[in-house]
Every structure is written in C-alpha cells, then in structure tokens.
Amino acid sequence: MDGVLPICIGNATKVVQFLVASGKEYQGSITLGFATTTEDLDGEEIARQAVTEPFTSDQVDAALAQMTGAITQIPPMFSAVKVNGRRLYDYARSGETVERPERHITISSFKQRQASTYDSATQTQTIYFTVACSKGTYVRTLAVDVGKVLGVPAVMSDLTRLKSGGFTLDETVTFEEIAAHVDTTLSDPQSRSFRDTGPKCGWRFTDLYWECD
C-alpha cells in the first residue's frame, strides 16, 4: 500500500486525535478467484476457484452496494488489533486462531472507477474501485467480503490511500523530498520551515513544526 500518511512532530502531536478520527479515501483493486492468509498479495494462497465467466458490471456494482453504509466487519488475523493483550498477527504467525471482535464501520462510498478486467489464462477477474470509509476499516476485508457476495474467493491486489486526516495525495511529500529539504535547511539557517517545498507539501500545520527544524 502507498499514499497519504500524516506524520505529527513536536507540538503537532496535539492534533493526532483529530487526524485519526477522520475518515479515509482509497483507490485500489480486488482480484477474484483466489484467497490468501493475509487477504492481500503478501500472504500464502489458501483457496482458489476459477472465475469461468466474468461478472458483469451490474453484478459488481450490486456487490459493492451491499457493502455500503453502516456495516460490521471482522478484522483479519494478520492485523494489529489486540485480543487478550496480544496482537492478532502474533496469533496468526503462531498458527493460532482466536475469536475476533466485530467492528462497526461506515462505508460512505464504494464504487468502480473503471471497467474490470478478466484474465482468461488464470481465470481471475480484477475490479478497480474507490472507497470512502470511517476509521478502523480494513479494506483488505472489504475485498474478501465482496468476493463472498459474488460467491468466489478474493484478495485486495492493490491499494493507494488518497485522503487521510484532511490531507490529499496532491499535498503529500515523499521521504526523499523531506530528506533533501532537511539537508538544505541544515546548510541554510534562514530556511526554517517546509513553506517552500512546493504545491505537493502536506504540512498544513506548518507553524507547529518550526521548533523541530
């Protein structure tokens, strides 16, 4: 996964609770036809069922619509959620399974962003989507649940976070850009903030960072 990740430093940590509470927006893809332990492409394959006939756009739209609104979700075993003081991924790596608490989430929008593609060689189908959701949502699990609605195993095959904490992808900077700016700042004491990092700069609360330069 890539995309927007707000990072708070110094006095800016005072706004973390507000950033965390905000919703998020993503774009990504769901591949139908197989499932993995992690619900994405990083895990081991645990199920496969050929998609012999590609689902129509209307069928996909109907499946996404079923996952829209106020819904409940079971977090994946490979996640940081704690159960009895242990992270779920600790249980998963030990080969253990535990009962996972339901989470109440809200999916504000879940739509196709372009036509799906069908691979006749692997008999898989890939859906391309955008989703707006509340905090605590596992998009991997949304992908799996879409597959369940359609009657086939599924994984999240790609994901980019477009918006988080009020910041959009266009406002972000890369770690490489930050490192380059820090080098410039150290060599030029008059440069005391990220104000001149250009239109991609995501540091909206610039004044809060001055003491950390």
Where are the regions that the model predicts?
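Catalytic/RNA-binding core of pseudouridine synthases
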Residues: M1-D213
